C-alpha cells in the first residue's frame, strides 16, 4: 500500500510540474528563425558539458545558435552562464573561446562563472547582472523549465530552441526522463520558493539590458 501511495504521489508531482512548465512557457518558446522583431537583445546561454577546452554536443549547439543570432544582428549581448570549475571542464571559459572563434567580439560577452544550475543562472542574471528582458537558449526538453525559472526571477524571457545535431538517441531519452522526473519538480518548487537552491554569490557584474 505504501508503495502504491508513493507512486501515486510521485506521478501527481510529475504531472503538476510538467503542467507548470508548459503553462510558464506558453507563447514564449520559438525556433531561432521565429524571433519577433521586438525580441530582447540580451541572450543567456546555459552551460553544459565541456572537456579539454571543447564544448560537448549540447553546449556546442547552443553556442552555434548564439553566434548565429549575434551575426544576424538579433542580439548584442551574450551572457555565458555555467560552472567554470576545473571539475566541470571550465564551461564558461570554453563558451567564451568558442564564441570569439565564431566571430563574436569579446566586449559582447558577459561571463557568469558560478551559474551552477538553471535556477542559479536565472537568479544571478536578474540580481547580479540586472537582466530584465532576455532570450535564453537551450534544447527543447529543457527550455520550458528555463523559461519558468527565469520568469520566477522577474525576467521577461523568451526561450530559443537549440537543435541537437550529433546527440545520441540514448542521451536524449535519458535527458527527457530526468527532466520529467527530477528537474521539473525541483524547478517548480524552487520557482514557488520551496527548497531554494543554495548558491554562492559572486562579485556584482555589469548591468545588462
Question: Predicted regions span which residues?
Answer:
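A structural signal for short, hydrophobic/glycine-enriched beta-strand patches
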Residues: 20-177
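A transmembrane-helix-recognition feature enriched in membrane-embedded lipid enzymes
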Residues: 169-199
Amino acid at each position: 500500500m505504501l508503495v502504491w501511495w508513493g507512486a501515486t504521489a510521485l506521478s501527481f508531482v510529475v504531472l503538476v510540474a510538467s503542467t507548470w512548465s508548459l503553462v510558464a512557457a506558453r507563447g514564449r518558446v520559438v525556433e531561432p528563425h521565429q524571433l519577433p522583431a521586438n525580441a530582447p537583445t540580451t541572450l543567456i546561454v546555459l552551460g553544459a558539458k565541456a572537456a579539454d577546452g571543447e564544448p560537448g554536443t549540447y553546449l556546442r549547439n547552443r553556442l552555434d545558435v548564439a553566434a548565429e543570432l549575434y551575426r544576424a544582428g538579433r542580439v548584442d549581448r551574450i551572457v555565458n552562464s555555467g560552472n567554470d570549475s576545473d571539475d566541470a571542464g571550465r564551461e564558461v571559459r570554453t563558451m567564451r573561446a568558442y564564441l570569439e572563434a565564431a566571430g563574436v567580439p569579446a566586449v559582447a560577452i558577459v561571463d557568469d562563472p558560478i551559474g551552477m544550475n538553471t535556477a542559479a543562472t536565472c537568479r544571478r542574471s536578474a540580481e547580479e547582472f540586472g537582466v530584465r528582458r532576455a532570450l535564453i537558449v537551450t534544447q527543447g526538453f529543457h527550455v520550458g523549465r528555463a523559461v519558468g525559472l527565469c520568469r520566477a526571477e522577474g525576467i521577461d524571457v523568451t526561450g530559443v530552441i537549440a537543435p541537437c545535431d550529433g546527440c545520441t538517441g540514448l542521451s536524449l531519452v535519458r535527458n527527457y526522463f530526468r527532466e520529467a522526473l527530477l528537474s521539473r519538480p525541483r524547478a517548480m518548487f524552487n520557482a514557488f520558493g520551496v527548497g531554494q537552491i543554495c548558491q554562492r554569490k559572486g562579485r556584482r557584474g555589469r548591468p545588462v539590458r
